[in-house]
């Protein structure tokens, strides 16, 4: 709820840079990053790059949410994807065994709710900058309906642990079809 993904996707994004985004869980598969075969419509199969390889090929931005939730399968691929671009390469498990290298401009931003020490040292070391985001991005607050922006700011000032901006957006949406008291009961209790 503080807008980490919002900031990761939009902050300092060059005009034509593509963004590829995923949210990891313990059950996420490396195929999400590397790729896999899909039916081609003619009874055969064709290779489909995962978002990590797409970001490499285009010099795009790869946003990895909840990186600290990555399982062993994904973590093994992250070591390669996050390696120094001057030496990074990955041989795809496709028919041609193609070797892919990151195109100039490739960048990775990872988010997590934990602390950097929650990551394996070799992964944490691949991020030269670590930023603690403990306030909501102003644009995220501005995305709330005007009548809720003040209420959110008041909640932020009064509560030790404020409700996430996501909860306030859900409240705003429910308030369109339900009485405010019912929407508040559903979202905030």
Where would I find each of the regions flagged by the language model?
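C-terminal regulatory/interaction module of P-loop NTP-utilizing enzymes
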Residues: 1-189
